């Protein structure tokens, strides 16, 4: 009988209709390399998802047995966490063939390790960005760091996706014989822009962008962490031809729109909301701008590199792993809008430099090809299993 492999991670809160849906499940890029590697080793695949009738669902990619994990993002919803714990315990009891639990994200990572060791399983934990990091608030640097150090004792294999986390994890004491690894995130499909074409002039006209505008694209939720405020504050100080298109929505949307108006740059800030044509928008832009305060290995930066854009990004974990300064773009302290404005102006005034940086990034991102990550995961699994 094949050994069982269980994959779990936090999930988003969804609508009742989505939760009760019987639509077949398709794996995402988040778990794709892991499921592929386990399948290559002949493991029987199990996966936790937040769907009421999970056990009845079929998977479009692999032969996976699902269960309703009831694991969400909130670290303060004790009732929900308790249900997630109980559901996981019941599932492990009902499937003694499971020998490996691969857990991800804060809540999934804690529950997976506690329950995994409770039932004598090999435990793999993949950290997609520790909540303690350089420049983090005191709570993160104390409570969250303590939790990770404590949970490391229940971890056979700890996988990180950036250099800062890799170095931090090496200072943890893992379960006997445990080991720390680093992989290149969850990978990107190098062919994802194949077949994507755009008439730049028409696309820009549809967005009411001036013909001579230097277009910076901003992608992400409009929340405190993504720090779009710093980008808007940089605009009055930057080259007047720079316009930004902001793809995303969130709780700070109205606040950011008011800020743009108060600073007199509302006509240069184009709030586009949720978009299904983000790849086309990358190709119609000149510069990628990202001011986030905390990331693991940001997918938006990786996609911008794939699109051949120069990247002006915050000097934080993840970004510094991806962007080589003065080769693929530039880095700035997350709250320093003066520095950001200067970097944007330099690129706005130098089209050839934009091309040079973008060309470099298209080559650099090849290290993060999903096929590379699949092989990294397979090598780790072969060691651990």
Please place each PLM-identified region on the residue numbering.
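A conserved mid-protein helix/loop that constitutes part of the nucleotide-sugar donor-binding site
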Residues: 21-33, 214-237, 251-258, 302, ...
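Short hydrophobic beta-strand element within catalytic cores of glycosyltransferases
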Residues: 310-313, 323
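Short His-centered aromatic/hydrophobic patch
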Residues: 103-109, 127
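Donor nucleotide-sugar binding/catalytic pocket of nucleotide-sugar-dependent glycosyltransferases
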Residues: 67-68, 149, 153-199
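Aromatic "clamp/platform" in nucleotide-sugar-dependent glycosyltransferases that forms part
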Residues: 274, 293
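N-terminal strand-loop element at the rim of the active site
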Residues: 7-80, 164-173, 179-180, 251
